[in-house]
Amino acid sequence: MLQTALGTRGMVTAPHALAAQAGLDILRQGGNAIEAMVAAASTIAVVYPHMNSIGGDGFWVILPPNGSPLAISACGGAAAAATIDAYHKRGMKRIPMRGPWAANTVAGTVGGW
C-alpha cells in the first residue's frame, strides 16, 4: 500500500535512510534544498554506491524561489591531447568509442557539488 507523507517545512527522500537523514539534517541546520541534495547524494555515494557515485557527471537546472533559472554543468573535461586535430592526424573521422583514443572525461560530479 502506498503511504503519503506531507510536510510544511521541507522533506528529503532517498533510496537509503542514512542519505535521507543527511539531507534532513542539513535542512534542520538552516541549509537549503541544494545543500540537502548534495548531502544526500554524497551519502548515497558511500552507502549505496551502485546507485550513485562520484564517478559521473551532473547537469542541474535550478529555479530559485525569487529568481531566474540557472544551470550547472558539472561535466569533466577530456584529456588535453584529445583535440580534433589529433584525431584527424591519425586518420580518424570519428572519436572511437573504445581504446586509447576514446575521449573519456574526468568525472565532474564533485566539482558540481
Q: Model-derived features: where do they sit?
A:
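Noncatalytic scaffold domains of N-terminal-nucleophile
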Residues: 1-21, 25, 33-112
